[in-house]
Amino acid sequence: MVIQWFPGHMAKARREVTEKLKLIDIVYELVDARIPMSSRNPMIEDILKNKPRIMLLNKADKADSSVTKAWKQHFEKDGIPTLAINSVNGQGLNQILPASKELLKEKFDKMKAKGVKPRAIRALIVGIPNVGKSTLINRLAKKNIAKTGDRPGVTTAQQWVKVGKELELLDTPGILWPKFEDELVGLRLAATGAIKDSIINLQDVAVYGLRFLEENYPERLKKRYDLEEIPEEIAALFDEIGKKRGCLMAGGEINYDKTTEVIIRDIRTEKFGPLSFEKPEDM
């Protein structure tokens, strides 16, 4: 499943982000805490060069907290300060400015020594579509400035946003992978709703989700669908879920499209509890 999804505004965004780097002090790299590697754009390292950076593990409330802790340690071992946040309810957002000041202390001390008038920290927010950039900006700015939505690709224009007197943010359109050569990356992004359902095979996503749950959270899978045991054959598992959820066609046959929708919706709406689809040790 090689998915290619690179609208023109994303290619343009890459060029504009590269140009804007000379205007900013620090980069906030926003990733989905459930899939920190799959929700990182592989071009980001190349684009950002040596800019100071803070990794923001967003949607931390939807992820397995013990795995998020391991990811935090993983990135910090690589020298990237990392915060677990929730841009919807504000969890962890009060740590962003202090962490930025700490990281930029030497730069701002040098500016002060040269007699440069103090100014706000200028930050660039980067991330793939639907990772929560607009929600984060609105929460920090305490007003509805950036368009938000659960559709990938909502933000399409870059804009500066003032956050008090000490921080200015530059939002960018989500820059997604030009293509997903690793099938797992595409499946993980699809399972969390980061890419449009119209460009993927949803049954593949449902199969991935069930196998993932069977391997990592089997008791949650059994509890959700009232299963005594998890059938080995994926078709049999679909049949069981279809029956339990009443996804039937005339004549009592299983409606696999409906069953697929139920499984994906249950994953995305946290009916299995907080899930982490990636662990540092598996990368």
Swiss-Prot record:
CDD domains associated with the record: Ras_like_GTPase, YlqF
Show the Gene3D superfamilies listed in the entry. 1.10.1580.10, P-loop containing nucleotide triphosphate hydrolases
Tell me the Gene Ontology biological-process terms attached to this UniProt entry.
ribosome biogenesis; translation
Please give the GO cellular component terms listed in this UniProt entry: cytoplasm
| Keywords carried by this UniProt record | Cytoplasm, GTP-binding, Hydrolase, Nucleotide-binding, Ribosome biogenesis, RNA-binding
Question: Where is this gene product found?
Answer: Cytoplasm
Q: Where does GTP bind?
A: N58, K59, A60, D61, N86, S87, N130, V131, G132, K133, S134, T135, G174
- Main location as per UniProt: cytoplasm
Which GO molecular function annotations are given, in alphabetical order?
Answer: GTP binding; GTPase activity; RNA binding
Residue ranges constituting the CP-type G domain according to the UniProt record: 14-178
| Main function | Essential protein that is required for a late step of 50S ribosomal subunit assembly. Has GTPase activity that is stimulated by interaction with the immature 50S ribosome subunit. Binds to the 23S rRNA. Required for the association of ribosomal proteins rplP and rpmA with the large subunit.
Q: Provide the family line.
A: Belongs to the TRAFAC class YlqF/YawG GTPase family. MTG1 subfamily.
What does the subunit section of this Swiss-Prot or TrEMBL entry state? Answer: Interacts with ctc. Interacts with the immature 50S ribosome subunit. 2 molecules of rbgA bind to one 50S subunit.
What is the name of this protein? Ribosome biogenesis GTPase A
According to its UniProt entry, this protein's organism is: Bacillus licheniformis (strain ATCC 14580 / DSM 13 / JCM 2505 / CCUG 7422 / NBRC 12200 / NCIMB 9375 / NCTC 10341 / NRRL NRS-1264 / Gibson 46)
